[in-house]
């Protein structure tokens, strides 16, 4: 059984037991979080596709931890002007473990 749900403007395909990195959620480590924006639920031969959401669909997950991703380096450069600017960015994420999927 797997599901596709939406969180933080992104869609994630998950199954029970999977660990997923999502955009940062303001939830403490160890707590459970429910996602009700489920777009698709598949169970063997049965597939429930939402229009746009599956009615009564829910994905339950436990927060494993929070962290920051790899550094992305940004360079702004202006030719012939002796000007360059270098910046870095590390995006916050929340890691969750999927515990239940229900239609």
Curated annotation (Swiss-Prot):
Q: Which GO terms describe its cellular component?
A: cytoplasm; ribonucleoprotein complex; ribosome
GO molecular function list:
rRNA binding; structural constituent of ribosome
Q: Which family does it belong to?
A: Belongs to the bacterial ribosomal protein bL21 family.
Q: Alphabetically list the UniProt keywords.
A: Ribonucleoprotein, Ribosomal protein, RNA-binding, rRNA-binding
Q: Which domain of life is it from?
A: Bacteria
For the keyword Repeat, the answer is no
Question: Could you give the subunit structure recorded for this chain?
Answer: Part of the 50S ribosomal subunit. Contacts protein L20.
- Give me any GO biological process, just one: translation
Q: What is this protein called?
A: Large ribosomal subunit protein bL21
Biological role stated in the UniProt entry: This protein binds to 23S rRNA in the presence of protein L20.
Q: Which HAMAP family match?
A: Ribosomal_bL21
KW Ribonucleoprotein (keyword) present: yes
